[in-house]
Amino acid sequence: MFAVFSKVWSLFAAPITLLLIAQFLAPEVQGFYYTFLSLIALQSFVGLGFSIVITQFASHEWANLSLDDAGFISGDERARLRLISLGRLVFKWYAWASAVFVLLVGAGGYLFLSQSPEPGISWKVPWFSLVVVAGLQFWVLPFLSLLEGCNQVHTIYRFRFIQGIVGSLAIWLTLFLDFGLWMAVAGLGMGLFCSLYLLLVFYKNFFQPFFTIKPKEGIQWREEIWPMQWRLALGGSLSYFVVSIYTPILFHYHGPVVAGQMGMTWQLVSALGSLAMAWVATKVPRFGILIAQKNYAELDRFFFRNSGISMGVISLGAVLLWLLVYGLNYFEHPLAQRMLSPLPFGLFIAGTVLGQITQCQAAYLRAHKKEPFLVYGLVHGFSNGIVVWFLGSRYGAIGASAGYLLVKSLVAVPLCSYIWIKCRKKWHADEVY
């Protein structure tokens, strides 16, 4: 329930944030803000798919574990030690990855943003501050992913709901106080504070053995995790070219104003997709439990019911959002100039609806602790990056949006559906009736 509340809040807060950005930020500063966010998304290149691996592997171990009244992990000792081994491995990995992210993205982003023809905008200190906060938030990610895999979804999403509210309020206050680009630092910083409070207060006893026990035997990274992770690493890295490439391309070739329009549009579209995906993402631990029990019939019923709701939500939301953008342009509202026009907006949101199909299918298959999307990720990422770059650099937002929809229609949905049908048939041959 709180997962849905959280996504509803995001959908509710997004228009308010957009209005305040339009009111308090110049169009050029808006472009810098959304380009900041797109560059921060380069985290996917250092995360190497570990967050998905953590959730999937933890859910399989949690099938034999539970929390006692004091919040400690109890149950099968072998499963407990394997879970602790997994946690210790990923906590160390993310500590190093966070440091690499801060150094490389901080410096690389500085060089990229320095090419802007808007020298009067004060962006350097906010940028480096944002990178540091994002690096800390990135280090916290495996702790949250582990909790999700251990079926603590209700508590996590309750805190994410609170986190979303607090983060939005911080952004709004920063805008009201005319701190400009510091809004990005304020929003992410409050999110980091909420995450740390959850881990250090609510789950202190849960995480205690991860720092006091060193299992002699446990998860074998090379034999168990790496066969799945290296595929996720490639696919996750290339996902940047599917999710976050649009604003930087338009920033580089067409300037910060067009990039700002693209960023605001993508924020609305992403909020809708995130809301719709809540009906599937929160069920992933349950998928893992049913798969471990080989109860595939119940798995399919559970999946189709929730993915159907997800597709219904995103389809209805897409129509409503497009009508909103059309109305703003029809009545010549000033906010219309801060977003893409109805044609490219419609192309982007149509592609997002199609992309929801692949998101649901991917969640289903990855719950099997396998990663069959290597070829898909390579083809989808490269084709989208090349097509969007080629069309976007030449024809602006219309070219980028047309390329996005074209790749979703002709590459992503057909290829992902083929993989889903093939793997589902192969992996469920040993169903327990």
Label for each model-derived stretch:
Residues 128, 157-207, 383, 397-421:
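Hydrophobic alpha-helical transmembrane segments
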Residues 135-160, 346, 350-377:
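Membrane-interface junctions at transmembrane-helix termini in multi-pass inner-membrane proteins
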Residues 109-130, 256-257, 297, 323-353:
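Interfacial segments at transmembrane-helix termini and the short loops linking adjacent helices
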Residues 34, 70-96, 225-229, 295-312, ...:
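Interfacial transmembrane-helix starts/ends
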Residues 1-60, 64, 230-257:
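Signature of the first transmembrane helix
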Residues 181-187, 199-243, 294-297, 423-433:
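Interhelical loop/hinge segments that connect adjacent transmembrane helices in multipass membrane
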Residues 48-77, 269, 273-294, 367:
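Helix-loop junctions and terminal segments of transmembrane helices
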